[in-house]
From Swiss-Prot:
The name this protein goes by in its record: Transcriptional repressor NrdR
Cofactor remark from the record: Binds 1 zinc ion.
Cofactor(s) required for function per UniProt: Zn(2+)
Coiled coil: none
Organism expressing this protein natively: Pelotomaculum thermopropionicum (strain DSM 13744 / JCM 10971 / SI)
GO molecular function per UniProt: ATP binding; DNA binding; zinc ion binding
Upper taxonomic lineage: Bacteria, Bacillati, Bacillota, Clostridia, Eubacteriales
Gene Ontology biological process: negative regulation of DNA-templated transcription
PROSITE patterns: ATP_CONE
Similarity annotation: Belongs to the NrdR family.
Function (record text): Negatively regulates transcription of bacterial ribonucleotide reductase nrd genes and operons by binding to NrdR-boxes.
């Protein structure tokens, strides 16, 4: 494995363990050239998914692009990278389970919003403000009102009615 610091092509594995989701292996490595440590992830090479954009363009699904969008929405929020990785893992798993080679970007956006709403309201609103392309402040306020209403309904539910975190 090539070192990201010095480019040396040999490293040794210090620690190896499956990720929480069990779909990849996390390896802690040490470069044999500069002795710096870095982490790699090994995962099964699955068939590629194609994302169909709103304008009809098609492009390959990139989990890193999805993760970056989540990181941006959760910037300066108390949300760990591990939780965001778990969300991306869950969304990717759900997309692959559809057995459809092409997935509409709107479907992916709705999956993200559903999970962010449960995870962090501020991150949800940030993501929604970009994803939903609100026409004006009034439509944005309507979305906030809907979010608050959904949360109030959740608080009114009885024991066991709460939604579990993904």
């Amino acid at each position: 494995m090539r070192c990201p610091f010095c480019g040396f092509s040999d490293s040794r594995v210090l620690d190896s363990r499956p990720t929480v989701e069990g779909n990849s292996i996390r390896r802690r490595r040490e470069c044999c050239g500069c002795s710096k440590r870095f982490t790699t992830y090994e995962r099964v090479d699955e068939p590629s998914l194609i994302v169909v954009k709103k304008d009809g363009r098609r492009e390959a699904f990139h989990r890193q692009k999805l993760l970056q969008g989540l990181i941006k929405a959760c910037q300066k929020r108390p949300v760990s990278t591990e939780k965001l990785e778990a969300i991306v893992d869950g969304i990717e798993r759900e997309l692959r389970q559809t057995m459809e080679p092409e997935i509409k970007s709107q479907y992916i956006g709705e999956l993200v919003m559903e999970r962010l709403r449960k995870l962090d309201e501020v991150a949800y609103v940030r993501f929604a403000s970009v994803y939903r392309e609100f026409r004006d402040a009034e439509s944005f306020m309507e979305e906030l009102k809907n979010l608050l209403e959904k949360n109030r309904e959740g608080l009114r539910g009885g024991p066991g009615d709460h939604v579990q975190d993904h």
